[in-house]
Structures are given as structure tokens and as C-alpha cells.
């Protein structure tokens, strides 16, 4: 048996220098990561007899081991702390759930470059603008660029194989550089103006366009003057919508709000006085978490764990924390740029601050209301199934295909707080008879629950299968084959009328059949999860089917293997454009002889 943790013995050998500490339980699971200016003093504070917060007391009660790492200074300790939190995600740390890469606007190289949304590593040659707080904010900007400057946004493979202008030209969203309807110099000017807008230099851009309009009018080029007038009008309209009153420079306004049910951090991004967008974050927090702790943890994880994120020149926050000086120093050292942080602000900045606080409060209230709604449905389901307590994890499976083609199985997961989308899975089904839903479900469940033997994944409390007695029986067989610990099986079959609200339910085996009233919260939960599984399955199936059909018509052509199929489709920009091409045009594609072009053409046009 492991000896109990002795705080006095540990503290007697603990250093008083800056560093990072890691707390483990008796199973050597990492519970918490922290940093300190003085390790000995900070760790001693955990073991005082009174005054500990409930969360801290619960943490201390589980400590079996503490490890420390001494660092050169507090800044280095903070950077190491954020690295460890991101890697291990300890349960007692405040965790920022949203860690996806943020989107950028990407401007490609070339004579007629395109604007597009980009996520991930910046490997392509070109220019990047952002990051933006959401993809929606980027789509707004790209839409404006199309309307105002008519710059292209189509894929290069599509652009290179156009023989006539597309619909975007007809509706005045593109100048059709693909077919030479705009000179390179004119297009380059449109791109330069677009870049000025994305860089937040809207006022300078408007002044430049106004001067150009006056110049065009003075030379009686009224068509050009009218075009510039329309561009100025659009830009001013957007400036009115997106500008922060009295705003200039690059500012992030961050407000944290906490109540007993959770926490929300609302961030408003202002660049060049223009609002790029805003976003809500819902960190994973413990009971009775202080709002200042939430703010400090958020800023550290947001700016230190993801160095690619854009750094403003100023942060406006609604609370202060004693760690802010060290935090700002660490951010500046990591980024090599100056950053100021403000709390007591007046005038316009105070209104920005209050706006962020209001948004955080409202977002958390809406989230908690929805959580309570879902939690109430889970409680109702527990009552219907005679469970001692509500289930914590419910998985639902569904199958989608088109007459056996491109079969996909889906797995969606719900908890009392709603859908757990990071746990969703899709399974491409292979090697079963086309249209055999039982075999497809058998394969999906086998693949899912086989991983439990390897210690991967969590066991659900309830397994929901979209289907009747047959699917339920098959699911039970899979669980028995894999010796999966007993769990509740629930089958959902459409009733005699096949209308929503008249479903027949099967519990654990086909003999236990029952129905619920149409207004039952438990039935509503079952319907919600089943419909989500169906949606997730059918979107996966459609994507797989589309990918298959793009290549299937070429698969029977001798001499056209997978690589050549990909190259052909990339060269022509898709199967539709390839189908329109003549034999001579196909023969011009790299690696395609005249004879092979004839075979491809014949295959594409055979009845």
C-alpha cells in the first residue's frame, strides 16, 4: 500500500525559487499544474488548516505526489505551465475547451491571386490576414471583397480550366480573369485595395477611392467614376456597421462572467477601429471559481498556448489578477511585441467593456438554460427506465446509404449538458452486402467497442440504436461477443404510422416493448439524439458518395489509375468540366495520349 502524502516532509526539501509544480493522485494521474514565484511558499498555502476553497480542499484530499521543476524566472514558469496544461489537460485546472486553429484570410501568389479561408499551418506561399474570431467573420469580409472589388475566390483548378465566365461574373462578383476579361494591372489594383481593407486601413482606402473618383469625373470617365462611387458607398456602409465609436488601433476586449453553473468569457476583436467579430468561450471550471482566476487562465491559454493567434496592442478586461504583470511579460517575451492591459477605463472604452460583460452574462444564461432543459430530459429518461440516477453518456448509432452505395455509420454522443461533438465518430463500412443494414451496424459497433479492450474511449450508460428488434438483437450479440460490461440497450423503431411521436421502443431485448406519450420529455430526448445521429450519418454518406461518383466513371478505363484520375480531375477542375472537354482538350492534359483521351471520352459519353 502506498504511504500517505506527507506535506511537511515534502516542504522541508522544496525550493523557494520560481518554477512549476505538478500534483498527482495515488494512481499517478495528473490532477493539477501550477506555477509560482516561490515554489515553497505557494505549495505551503495548500496545506494550511483553514480557509481553503472547496475545490482546493477536494484537490488536496487527492494528492499523493508532487513534482516540481525549477525555472530561471516567473515568466519561464508561466510558459512551461501553459505547455503542460495544453498537453495534459488536468481536471483541476481551468481549461479552455475551444482549441481549434483560428481561420485566416489567405491571398495566394500569382498574376491573378485568389482570396480564401485558411486554417492550420501557413505552408502556402502568399499573404495571411487575421486570425479572425470565427469563420463567419471571414465569410463576411470575403463577401464584401467580392461585392466591392470583384476579386476571385474560386479554386485554382476551376480557374485554370474555364472557357467562359461563370455565374459570379454574371452577378457582378468577379471580373472573370480566368478568360481574360480584366487586365492584370486593373486586377492588381483591386487586390491592393482589398489588402488595404483587410489591414484595417479603411479610411485611407476611402480617401484614395474618392480621389480616384474625382479624377475620373474630371476626365469625363463617368463609368469609372460611378464604379468608384459604388465602392466608396459600400465601404462607408460597412464602416458604420463595424466601427467602434471613437475606436482606433488594435484592441481585444475580454470579459469574464462566472456563476454557480459555469463560466463564460466573451472576446471582441477590434482591428484598426473595425470590429472583426466576437466569440464566446466556456472554460471548464470547478465549483466556486473566482472570476479573476478564470480571466487569468483564459488569457494564458489563449495567447501563450497558441502563438499563431493575432496579438493586439491593448487588452481591456473587466477584472484584475495578481498574475497579470507576469502574464503580460510572458506574452511580450514570447511574441516580441508590446502589449498593455487596462481595467479601469472611461468613455468609449468603458462602453466596450460593459458590452463584453453583457454579452458574457447573456451567453452563459442561454447556455445554462439549454443545459437545464437537456438535463431535465435526461432525468425524465432515467425515470422512464427506472434508473437510480440520470445517465451521463448516451451513444446513438445510425446507418446511411443509397441502395447500398457508400455506406456510412454514425455515432453521436450526448450528456446532460447536450451533445459531446468531440466524441462523434463516423465509420466507412466496407466488405458487407450492399444494403445490409444489420451487417453494417454489426461492423460499426464491433469497431467502436473493440477499442474498449485497448483502453480507448468511454463506456456509455445507454446505447441507443435506430432500428427495431433486429438491430437491437444484433447490438446485443456484438456486446456479448466482445464481453462488453452490461449496459442499457434501447432500440427505436418507427410506429405503424411512421410518424414522429409514435415510435416503438425496445429496452434491452425485443420482449420488452413500450411506447411513450408524444409530449414526454424522455421521448423528446430520444428523438433529438436519433435525429442527430441520422443527420450526422447522412452528411457523411453524401460526402463519401460524392467523392466516389467523381471518380467511378473513370475507374473502368484501362490505363487510368487512381493517381491519373486525381490528376485529370484536378487539371479540369472536376468531372463536369472533364465531361464537357473534347478529345483534343483531354489529350492536352499531362500524361494523356491521344489514344487514351479517346478511351476516356468514349467512357464519359457512353449511354
UniProtKB/Swiss-Prot annotation:
<dbReference type="InterPro" id="IPR010994">
    <property type="entry name" value="RuvA_2-like"/>
</dbReference>
<keyword id="KW-0963">Cytoplasm</keyword>
<dbReference type="InterPro" id="IPR047296">
    <property type="entry name" value="GIY-YIG_UvrC_Cho"/>
</dbReference>
<protein>
    <recommendedName>
        <fullName>UvrABC system protein C</fullName>
    </recommendedName>
</protein>
<dbReference type="InterPro" id="IPR000305">
    <property type="entry name" value="GIY-YIG_endonuc"/>
</dbReference>
<dbReference type="Pfam" id="PF08459">
    <property type="entry name" value="UvrC_RNaseH_dom"/>
</dbReference>
<dbReference type="GO" id="GO:0003677">
    <property type="term" value="F:DNA binding"/>
</dbReference>
<dbReference type="GO" id="GO:0009381">
    <property type="term" value="F:excinuclease ABC activity"/>
</dbReference>
<dbReference type="GO" id="GO:0009380">
    <property type="term" value="C:excinuclease repair complex"/>
</dbReference>
<keyword id="KW-0742">SOS response</keyword>
<keyword id="KW-0227">DNA damage</keyword>
<dbReference type="InterPro" id="IPR035901">
    <property type="entry name" value="GIY-YIG_endonuc_sf"/>
</dbReference>
<dbReference type="InterPro" id="IPR036876">
    <property type="entry name" value="UVR_dom_sf"/>
</dbReference>
<keyword id="KW-0228">DNA excision</keyword>
<comment type="subunit">
    <text>Interacts with UvrB in an incision complex.</text>
</comment>
<dbReference type="InterPro" id="IPR038476">
    <property type="entry name" value="UvrC_RNase_H_dom_sf"/>
</dbReference>
<dbReference type="Pfam" id="PF22920">
    <property type="entry name" value="UvrC_RNaseH"/>
</dbReference>
<keyword id="KW-0267">Excision nuclease</keyword>
<dbReference type="Pfam" id="PF14520">
    <property type="entry name" value="HHH_5"/>
</dbReference>
<dbReference type="InterPro" id="IPR001162">
    <property type="entry name" value="UvrC_RNase_H_dom"/>
</dbReference>
<dbReference type="InterPro" id="IPR001943">
    <property type="entry name" value="UVR_dom"/>
</dbReference>
<feature type="domain" description="UVR">
    <location>
        <begin position="203"/>
        <end position="238"/>
    </location>
</feature>
<dbReference type="Pfam" id="PF02151">
    <property type="entry name" value="UVR"/>
</dbReference>
<dbReference type="Pfam" id="PF01541">
    <property type="entry name" value="GIY-YIG"/>
</dbReference>
<keyword id="KW-0234">DNA repair</keyword>
<dbReference type="GO" id="GO:0009432">
    <property type="term" value="P:SOS response"/>
</dbReference>
<comment type="function">
    <text>The UvrABC repair system catalyzes the recognition and processing of DNA lesions. UvrC both incises the 5' and 3' sides of the lesion. The N-terminal half is responsible for the 3' incision and the C-terminal half is responsible for the 5' incision.</text>
</comment>
<dbReference type="GO" id="GO:0006289">
    <property type="term" value="P:nucleotide-excision repair"/>
</dbReference>
<dbReference type="InterPro" id="IPR050066">
    <property type="entry name" value="UvrABC_protein_C"/>
</dbReference>
<feature type="domain" description="GIY-YIG">
    <location>
        <begin position="16"/>
        <end position="94"/>
    </location>
</feature>
<dbReference type="InterPro" id="IPR003583">
    <property type="entry name" value="Hlx-hairpin-Hlx_DNA-bd_motif"/>
</dbReference>
<comment type="similarity">
    <text>Belongs to the UvrC family.</text>
</comment>
<dbReference type="InterPro" id="IPR004791">
    <property type="entry name" value="UvrC"/>
</dbReference>
<dbReference type="GO" id="GO:0005737">
    <property type="term" value="C:cytoplasm"/>
</dbReference>
Amino acid at each position: 500500500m502506498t504511504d500517505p502524502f506527507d506535506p511537511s516532509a515534502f516542504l522541508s526539501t522544496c525550493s523557494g525559487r520560481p518554477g512549476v509544480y505538478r500534483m498527482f493522485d495515488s494512481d499517478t494521474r495528473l490532477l493539477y499544474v501550477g506555477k509560482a514565484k516561490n515554489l515553497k511558499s505557494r505549495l505551503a498555502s495548500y496545506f494550511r488548516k483553514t480557509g481553503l476553497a472547496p475545490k482546493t480542499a477536494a484537490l488536496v484530499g487527492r494528492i499523493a505526489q508532487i513534482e516540481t521543476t525549477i525555472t530561471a524566472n516567473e515568466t519561464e514558469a508561466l510558459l512551461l505551465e501553459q505547455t503542460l496544461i495544453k498537453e495534459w489537460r488536468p481536471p483541476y485546472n481551468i481549461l479552455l475547451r475551444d482549441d481549434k486553429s483560428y481561420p485566416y484570410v489567405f491571398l495566394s501568389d500569382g498574376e491573378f491571386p485568389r482570396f480564401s479561408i485558411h486554417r492550420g499551418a501557413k505552408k502556402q506561399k502568399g499573404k495571411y490576414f487575421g486570425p479572425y474570431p470565427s469563420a463567419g467573420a471571414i465569410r463576411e469580409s470575403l463577401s464584401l471583397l467580392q461585392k466591392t472589388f470583384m476579386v476571385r475566390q474560386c479554386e485554382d483548378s476551376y480557374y485554370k480550366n474555364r472557357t467562359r465566365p461563370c455565374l459570379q461574373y454574371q452577378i457582378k462578383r468577379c471580373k472573370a480573369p480566368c478568360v481574360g476579361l480584366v487586365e492584370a494591372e486593373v486586377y492588381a489594383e483591386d487586390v491592393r485595395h482589398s489588402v488595404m481593407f483587410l489591414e484595417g486601413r479603411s479610411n485611407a482606402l476611402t480617401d484614395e477611392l474618392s480621389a480616384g473618383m474625382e479624377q475620373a469625373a474630371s476626365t469625363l470617365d463617368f463609368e469609372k467614376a460611378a464604379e468608384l462611387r459604388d465602392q466608396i458607398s459600400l465601404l462607408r456602409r460597412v464602416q458604420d456597421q463595424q466601427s467602434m465609436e471613437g475606436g482606433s488601433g488594435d484592441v481585444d476586449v475580454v470579459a469574464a462572467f462566472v456563476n454557480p453553473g459555469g463560466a463564460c468569457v466573451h472576446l471582441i476583436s477590434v482591428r484598426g477601429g473595425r470590429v472583426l467579430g466576437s466569440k464566446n468561450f466556456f472554460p471548464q471550471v470547478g465549483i466556486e471559481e473566482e472570476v479573476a482566476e478564470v480571466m487569468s487562465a483564459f488569457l494564458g491559454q489563449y495567447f501563450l498556448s497558441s502563438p499563431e493567434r493575432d496579438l493586439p496592442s491593448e487588452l481591456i478586461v473587466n477584472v484584475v489578477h495578481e498574475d497579470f504583470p507576469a502574464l503580460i511579460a510572458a506574452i511580450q517575451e514570447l511574441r516580441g511585441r508590446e502589449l498593455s492591459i487596462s481595467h479601469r477605463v472611461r468613455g468609449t472604452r468603458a462602453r466596450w467593456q460593459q458590452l463584453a460583460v453583457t454579452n458574457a452574462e447573456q451567453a452563459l444564461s442561454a447556455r445554462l438554460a439549454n443545459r437545464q432543459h437537456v438535463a431535465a430530459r435526461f432525468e425524465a429518461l432515467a425515470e422512464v427506465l427506472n434508473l437510480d440516477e440520470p445517465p451521463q453518456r448516451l451513444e446513438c448509432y445510425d446507418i446511411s446509404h443509397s441502395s447500398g452505395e457508400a455506406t456510412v455509420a454514425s455515432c453521436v454522443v450526448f450528456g446532460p449538458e447536450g451533445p459531446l461533438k468531440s466524441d462523434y465518430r463516423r465509420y466507412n463500412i466496407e466488405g458487407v452486402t450492399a444494403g445490409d443494414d444489420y451487417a453494417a451496424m454489426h461492423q460499426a459497433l464491433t469497431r467502436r467497442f473493440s477499442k474498449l479492450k485497448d483502453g480507448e474511449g468511454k463506456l456509455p450508460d445507454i446505447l441507443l440504436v435506430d432500428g427495431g428488434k433486429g438491430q437491437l438483437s444484433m447490438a446485443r450479440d456484438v456486446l456479448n461477443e466482445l464481453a462488453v460490461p452490461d449496459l442499457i440497450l434501447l432500440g427505436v423503431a418507427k410506429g405503424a404510422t411512421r410518424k414522429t411521436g409514435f415510435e416503438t421502443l425496445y429496452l434491452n431485448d425485443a420482449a420488452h416493448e413500450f411506447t411513450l406519450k408524444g409530449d414526454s420529455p424522455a421521448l423528446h430526448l430520444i428523438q433529438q439524439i436519433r435525429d442527430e445521429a441520422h443527420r450526422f450519418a447522412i452528411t457523411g454518406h453524401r460526402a463519401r458518395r460524392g467523392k466516389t461518383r467523381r471518380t467511378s466513371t473513370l475507374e473502368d478505363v484501362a490505363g487510368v489509375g487512381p493517381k491519373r484520375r486525381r490528376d485529370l480531375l484536378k487539371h479540369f477542375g472536376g468531372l463536369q468540366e472533364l465531361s464537357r472537354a473534347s478529345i483534343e482538350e483531354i489529350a492536352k492534359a499531362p500524361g494523356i495520349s491521344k489514344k487514351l483521351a479517346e478511351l476516356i471520352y468514349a467512357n464519359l459519353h457512353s449511354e
